[in-house]
Amino acid sequence: MINVPTNNFNAIIVNDTSDYPEWVRGHGAHRIATHLRENGYSVLVIDFSSALNIHIWEEILKVSIGPDTRFVGFSSSWWPYRNKTGNQLPIPSNGSHDPEEVRRVRAMFGNNGQNTLTESAFLGKAKPWVDLVKKYNSKTKILLGGVKIDWYADFPADHFMAGYGEVQILDFLQQPKRIWNTLINHDSSAESKNWGWVESFTSYTKYDQIRSDELMTLEIARGCRFSCLFCAWPLIGKKDIAKYVKESKSLYTELLDNYTKWGITDYWIADDTFNDSTEKLKCVAEVVKLLPFKPKFRCYIRIDLIVTHPEQAQLLLDIGVNTVFVGIETFHPKSAKVIGKGMDSEKRKQALYHVQKIWGDQVRVQGGYIIGLPHEAYADICKSHAWFMQPDCPVHDIFYFPLIITPPELYPNKPTSELERSYEKYGYVITKENMHIGQWTKNDDSDITSFIQSNAIAKALNTNIQNKIKLSTVNNFRRHYSETNIIKDPTTEYFPNLLTMLKRDAEIVKVNTV
């Protein structure tokens, strides 16, 4: 036995962020950490794995791992999409780091040519990082969680954890003698026990080094009332609002705590559809009235709900929403009906004009449009694009996305949409040779016949939009990141401070060297 200075955390979770420089901390790691702390476990979250080199990694482990460290977990959610066993396939990133972005970030943070943790995982070279964990405690388990575990099946983990983790991770820690399968997925929806979702909130510690201008993630509801054909979110079709929406008290506590401790006022609401319930919006509006500050929110909404519930437009403004992303998807009547958004396109457009009158310059409206849906031809898309480009169009930013179909048989732990489970029914074909994300063909009454074609159209339209940027007085939330109080370079601003605090807080622990 030897004496070692360490914090001896029960768990360590390694996390990444969305694209730099306008990053958002991965929320899931901090949600799980909060849940475990509430149940008596000590947890360290390490953010910014895209900027973490292996030398700093070992320095952190030296003062963090001890005899009581049960697991070191890695979140795959913001790692790049890749082939299951390597980086052979160029795959649309959908907001996560693509391979070039990973390398650019490494260069920007000046890691002297060393692979960062995220890049090592992407290249299938994570073993040295895991070996260092085992060096300091051979009994510590390695877990891989997050939404992309199927894309990182070669990661040297003892266990892979699928889906929402609150129930599964607590079971894992509380049942140490249980023989756990490599894949832990016995409650991937975190619904088998009443663990307190509606009373829950996510909190942060001094080690997280939160800055006041950060955009934080806020869960108000977990689930959605609707079941759109293309939607792969796991908890759709929820009807009982009392079971999937947080209580006012917990929402108030989280917002006030983050403001009091860190000065946080800006949030991205993670709800699948924020305005799926007017009752929910009224509840949030009442919470906001009680706060000693005015929060600002970005969220995803359905515009057809504002057609049937026009009072929602004012409610969203009262809450403090300053940016909405509207899932328009298509204006083609047959296509819209197939995917579950069959309201007449003119009614949806009029609703967008309606909210513009109420919101004025205070809310920026962004929209998403999917290329490759059933029945919609290129000419139909061009007609919609022409409307988006009109000077008085109430949609300030439109983003085109190719339809991506992920075959369930290839990625069994990824939540799948109805379209992905029965794509043949809708005229899509995926051959064995092309059985990876996105490689479909189709033969229907449209002239868009493949993913490759839909991707090319989306890229061309997005480029066209960039060449004609809409300059307006409408709220633009994008300050240049140099003007914001956020961590801009984790290698100089985050990791040195983290190490200093960990070394200062370390206590002498007896460690068995055998």
Go through the PLM ranges and name each one:
Residues 39-41, 129-140, 261-262, 291, ...:
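A structural motif corresponding to the C-terminal end of an alpha-helix
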Residues 70, 264-265, 322, 394-396:
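Short acidic/polar active-site loop segments enriched in Thr and Asp
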Residues 196-364, 371, 386:
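Radical SAM [4Fe-4S] cluster-binding motif and immediate context
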